Each structure stands twice: as structure tokens, then as C-alpha cells.
Amino acid sequence: MPDRRQHRGPHPDDAALFGRPDVLHTLRLAAGDLAWLLGRQYAPTAALTLVGNHYQLHARQRQALARAVAAPAVAQARRQRQVPTAALAGMSLYVDGFNQLITIEVALSGGLVLRGHDGVLRDLASVHGTYRTITETPTALQALGTYLAPLHLQAVHVFLDAKVSNAGRLASRMRALATTHAWPWHVLLVPSADAVLRQTEAIVATSDSGILDTAVRWFDLAAAVVTQQVPQAWCVDLDVPPPLV
């Protein structure tokens, strides 16, 4: 069945699973326990099952923990390689195109975004191998360009997986927008964006944990855009110690 969604808004159960203070307290406790286990070399799948069963978490809550939680040493190592906005002037930025755009689209759609233990902003969208533009796509692209324009980057290289459906159309749309606004964007269709981003020494923009762990330097572009351009975004912060009770 074709994907006919016009938005990447919240899952019907998200208000109950992430919206109440008591639920957030439980999730933060669970996140802390999962980080503790990962830091002691527990297998990620086994650790998530153990924590999820203990706290009786819904599958979507477990998915959130899997994306947002890392072993403390891993999270710290990622933070140490993060670059501030001020360091971008005159540099080239390599952007994980679908990864960053979809997070901005989710935020604009009122969907849930997560801030993890490594400080990175992520979404819970399930877009694997297929992509279609939604109502918020033009606004998301404009927000991306509006944020990047004053940073005086030498170039912004946006990598899109060629095998993903509609990648070519999105690339054309981004190129046209960049030409209209004289943005220094180079939009590239490649066999694997992950492979390119894992190998470069340039500053990368992604929330993919595997890429972050190999990146020499990285910038949380989606988080910066959402913070500046989407102040109403629904962000659940799991990078907060659970309150004492």
C-alpha cells in the first residue's frame, strides 16, 4: 500500500507514552539503567529487553531508548568531537540528507523528537528505503537554508541515498532552492550516504550513532535548526537525570 501520509506527526499513542510527567520519570529511570548496563558491556538487545521488561515499557518507548541511550563513555566521546556553531565559518559541512531533513519535518509536524544521552536530537520516524515529500517539506528545506545561510560555510554537501525512492526528485528540489537563494549547496546522490560520511574528515551533520562514532568532528544541525526555527517542537529530553522522589 502506498504511503499517503501528508505529515510526520505524532503516533496516536505518543501522548500517553511520552506526554505525562510520571511516564517521563519512568523513561528517564529506564534510560539511566540502560546506560549503566551498556557501560558494562551488556549486549544492547539483551540490555534493552531487560530494562524494557523491568519497567513494562511499550515497544515504542523501547525504540526511543534504543535510539537515545548510549554507554556513558560512548556518549562522552561523541560530545568531545562535537563542534560549536562558531567553528563552522569557512568550513565544509557534510550533511546526512534524509536523516537531518526528516527530523526537521517531524518537529514541524508536531511529532516527537528526542534528545539523547549524547545530546543529539533524533526522531522516531520509520522511513526505510522510501521517502515522499509531505506538507512540511518546503518549510523544512527553507528552515534549513535560513539557518545555514548566515554561518558563512564554504560549502554544504548534502548526501542522499540514490536507492531511496524519490531521492532524485528531492535532490532536484534542493538544488533549485539553493540556486534561487544562492546557497552554497552541493546535493549529491550516492550509493550510500553512510559510507561517505563514515570516511570523510570533514564536519558531518547526522544523528546516526554509527557515523557519530567514526566522525572526526560533527555538528547537530537538525537540533540547531529546530531550536531556532521550530520553537514549538515537542522535544522529550532523556539527557536529564531523573528527579529524586
What are these regions, as identified by a protein language model?
Residues 1-93, 100-245:
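Charge-biased, low-complexity intrinsically disordered regions
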